[in-house]
Amino acid sequence: MSKEIAKKRIEELRDLLNTFNYQYHVLDNPSVSDAEYDRNMQELIKLEAENPEFMSEDSPSVRVGGTVLDIFEKVTHKSPMLSLGNAFNEGDLRDFDRRVRQGIDDANVRYICELKIDGLAVSLHYEKGRFIQGATRGDGVTGEDITQNLKTIKAIPLRLNEEVTLEARGEAYMPKRSFVKLNEEKEQNGEDVFANPRNAAAGSIRQLDPKIAAKRNLSMFVYGLANVEEKTILSHSESLDFLGELGFKTNPNRRTCETIEEVIAYVEEWQEKRPHLDYEIDGIVIKVDDVALQESLGTTAKSPRWAIAYKFPAEEVVTRLTGIELSVGRTGVVTPTAELEPVRVAGTIVRRASLHNEDLIREKDIRIGDYVVVKKAGDIIPEVVNVLFDKRTGEEEEYHMPTHCPACESELVRLEEEVALRCINPTCPAQIREGLIHFVSRNAMNIDGLGERVITQLFEADYIRTFADLYSLTKEQLLQLERFGEKSATNLVQAIENSKENSLERLLFGLGIRHVGAKAARTFAEHFETMDALVKATEEELKAINEIGEKMAQSVVAYFDNEDVLELLQQFKEYGVNMTYKGMKIADLQNVESYFAGKTVVLTGKLEVMGRSEAKKKIEALGGKVTGSVSKSTDLVVAGEAAGSKLAQAEKHNVEVWNEERFLQELNK
């Protein structure tokens, strides 16, 4: 076959397969058999392999999966992916309607209602009609680049019907039938099954090997247009029609409503129809349809005023409470958990539910053997709602909390003003294990690859008993553990070694000193600069620091007034763990050449590691200016948790947005 003929046939096959994909995955109206589709796909793959010069990034053949990735790169969203406020009942919906009408002087308002797909929110970027990048929502400001995995989803067009540049947003999901099939295969292979379709979709999309995602039969509904060049959109319903014309899959079950009564009727209708869908939904999204009215209403600090998400009531089921087990946390708090006869709740099998503390058990009169009502709080955490007293037989047993720790047999105490029982033995194995999990966590020593499962294995193998023991681990020890190979063992040893270079505040937070969070740990580290100086500090010296109260100061002094802790710090020194502050102090920033010099910066949302007042001082010390509102003259918005209206303003004025992690990286350069 000549090159010219091969090129022509490749183009014919691509057009043909794109048409087949659109008919099957978007229109749900296949025109050919699976066998014919596969035959054409194999011919295309063969021709492209023989003629690599004709390979294209938007060829249907890329949907079978490409190169295995090492990591997912971070992506900063051009416009933040905001969350929505929630409504839980009819009253909440009417309150929303009243707020909307007050905000627009009771002008005529039309709502558009859509099913809230229970999947993974993603953004899709197209340049002149070609799919160039896809990303997860992440924290709303920064997500992960999952382009290669999204290319395997056949409902996502690789080339649009127009050469337009835009960003679309939607929900990737796994159909129920695909979920059942996947779990059946995993069970047959002796693998852990997914709890629900949402977890399956998220787990599939975040596979580093796109070939795995390609096998999972994922789909996607596009629900919004974040921005589009050279086109004016007047309403949300118009944007959905436009997206459909471009070749996207939009959900057909949307409806425009003229009154809140029509909205409520739509909600009730889909609450009934919900079980009959082939995909999971967890509510209804209601939006003001008119874009001009959306802009007039604006946003709050957390969410747009023109939209709300109605959450379906949590499913409640009845099951029998067969026992109560206890767990000990890293601070010694002993928490009771109900053991239940297995029951399906909101798509997952539930065997345990939180009982929180002894007072709750007494208040609800929960006894072993009771029939209880269980639901998932926020559709996530199982909890016991109440006891069905009319089902009691008299054989149920009252439960009494133990007087001694279930892990170490030390006497339990109830501290003043606390409802929880607590083990105060510093050598309690359960506390040590939970403390180790905290020590290696992201905001502490951030040791990649060392999660709860591995910590448990190391603990059970008696390889670690203290934080310092982590730094004596060898590759040979790791190779003795389940699921560890040469590469993973080498990587973990290196990750542990790298953590020695962390700045002091990470180590302080990782130690788990009571009342000391990430922000306080940074305050102490910057103030004292070394661990030795902090250890010697008195309660009065600690209380003299801004935002450090008496309770925290007493806790820090008590923590370091312990021979075991001092021995631990000595071991850290011997292993070469850094115990000095590596960040810059405000006094040191005056003569530093900085990104922030001459820049106007806006801080919004809650900053976890560094408070906004401290961040403001540092930016100003570096020659920057911090203002309270976003305008055309703003150079940067730093967005913490629950940032809202200022993000929308940043998008309007095309201002760059950083999350806290990116901000700290720049500060510490």
Swiss-Prot record:
UniProt binding sites for NAD(+): D34, A35, E36, Y37, D38, S83, L84, E114, R137, E171, K287, K311
GO biological process: DNA repair; DNA replication
Enzyme Commission code: 6.5.1.2
Function: DNA ligase that catalyzes the formation of phosphodiester linkages between 5'-phosphoryl and 3'-hydroxyl groups in double-stranded DNA using NAD as a coenzyme and as the energy source for the reaction. It is essential for DNA replication and repair of damaged DNA.
Stored SUPFAM superfamilies: BRCT domain (SSF52113), DNA ligase/mRNA capping enzyme, catalytic domain (SSF56091), Nucleic acid-binding proteins (SSF50249), RuvA domain 2-like (SSF47781)
Key words, A-Z: DNA damage, DNA repair, DNA replication, Ligase, Magnesium, Manganese, Metal-binding, NAD, Zinc
Domain of life: Bacteria
Catalytic function, reaction form: NAD(+) + (deoxyribonucleotide)n-3'-hydroxyl + 5'-phospho-(deoxyribonucleotide)m = (deoxyribonucleotide)n+m + AMP + beta-nicotinamide D-nucleotide
Keyword Transmembrane: no
Record-annotated active site: K116
InterPro entries linked: BRCT_dom (IPR001357), BRCT_dom_sf (IPR036420), DisA/LigA_HHH (IPR041663), DNA_ligase (IPR001679), DNA_ligase_AS (IPR018239), DNA_ligase_CS (IPR033136), DNAligase_adenylation (IPR013839), DNAligase_N (IPR013840)
GO cellular component annotations of the record: cytosol
HAMAP family per the UniProt record, alphabetical: DNA_ligase_A
Gene Ontology MF terms: DNA binding; DNA ligase (NAD+) activity; metal ion binding
The organism of origin for this protein: Bacillus cereus (strain AH187)
Cofactor: Mg(2+); Mn(2+)
Positions contributing to Zn(2+) binding: C405, C408, C423, C428
Full protein name: DNA ligase
Residue span, BRCT domain: 591-669
Family: Belongs to the NAD-dependent DNA ligase family. LigA subfamily.
Signal peptide span: none
